[in-house]
């Protein structure tokens, strides 16, 4: 069910990150070198999840693996226990909660009209539902973390914190973000561009669907313009 996916991606996955933040407070901040294997594992897991996204043909699975890859960055930032790392982790968790939930919502609107989640069968929606294409573009840009979005603020803080802790981590972080941009572009082009493969009549997006996406993106834009609200 799409509601379960939205709650899982937006709230439950982030509760795990919040739990790690609370648990890490019992460890001394001077001994973060001991956690090097876990940081490497988190960043490597983020890269593997991103690579899995690139080969996905199922739209919903692609968005789910995207959430996992972002949580890898969050876990790595939390473990080093620096103020910038914790601020970046909180910012990215909140921003990606809105983004991934909006992506699941958009995937459901596509599924209700095509009755399939296979990427190659959902193309051509920019000809039929141009406003939906606009929502897809905005949400994918947030997923890529373009400035001045909250996603960008979170990833920039995480990159800075990890680079100060160990400069070698920039290689894994850069690779992860490059693959994120690749699969986000692939997802947008696969669902919106190209010729329409539907033979049946497609109903337009309802007002409630536009309202639902607006309720995801409006708070995200608000905290992007005023990050002091959350970090």
Swiss-Prot record:
Pfam families: Proton_antipo_M. It comes from the Eukaryota. Keywords: Electron transport, Membrane, Mitochondrion, NAD, Respiratory chain, Translocase, Transmembrane, Transmembrane helix, Transport, Ubiquinone. Coiled coil: none annotated. GO terms for molecular function: NADH dehydrogenase (ubiquinone) activity; ubiquinone binding. It is a multi-pass membrane protein. It catalyses: a ubiquinone + NADH + 5 H(+)(in) = a ubiquinol + NAD(+) + 4 H(+)(out). One of its GO terms (cellular component) is mitochondrial membrane. The chain crosses the membrane at residues 1-21, 34-54, 63-85, 89-111, 128-148, 156-176. Its EC number is 7.1.1.2. GO terms for biological process: ATP synthesis coupled electron transport; electron transport coupled proton transport. Its main location: mitochondrion. It is an enzyme of class 7 (translocase). It is found in: Mitochondrion membrane. Core subunit of the mitochondrial membrane respiratory chain NADH dehydrogenase (Complex I) that is believed to belong to the minimal assembly required for catalysis. Complex I functions in the transfer of electrons from NADH to the respiratory chain. The immediate electron acceptor for the enzyme is believed to be ubiquinone. Belongs to the complex I subunit 4 family. This is NADH-ubiquinone oxidoreductase chain 4. It comes from Crotalus concolor.
């Amino acid at each position: 069910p799409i509601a379960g996916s939205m709650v899982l991606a937006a709230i439950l996955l982030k509760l795990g990150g919040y739990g790690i933040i609370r648990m890490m407070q019992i460890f001394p901040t001077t001994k973060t070198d001991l956690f090097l294997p876990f940081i490497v594992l988190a960043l490597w897991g983020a890269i593997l999840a991103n690579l899995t996204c690139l080969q996905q043909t199922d739209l919903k699975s692609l968005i789910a693996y995207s959430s996992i890859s972002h949580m890898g960055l969050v876990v790595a930032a939390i473990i080093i226990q620096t103020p910038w790392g914790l601020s970046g982790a909180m910012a990215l968790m909140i921003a990606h909660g809105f983004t991934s939930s909006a992506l699941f919502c958009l995937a459901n609107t596509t599924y209700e009209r095509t009755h399939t989640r296979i990427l190659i069968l959902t193309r051509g929606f920019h000809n039929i539902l141009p406003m939906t294409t606009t929502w897809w573009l905005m949400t994918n840009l947030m997923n890529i973390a373009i400035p001045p979005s909250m996603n960008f603020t979170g990833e920039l803080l995480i990159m800075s914190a990890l680079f100060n802790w160990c400069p070698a981590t920039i290689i894994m972080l850069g690779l992860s973000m490059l693959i994120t941009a690749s699969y986000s572009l692939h997802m947008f082009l696969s669902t919106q561009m190209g010729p329409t493969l539907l033979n049946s009549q497609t109903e337009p997006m309802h007002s409630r669907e536009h309202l639902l996406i607006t309720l995801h993106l409006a708070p995200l834009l608000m905290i992007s313009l005023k990050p002091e609200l959350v970090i």
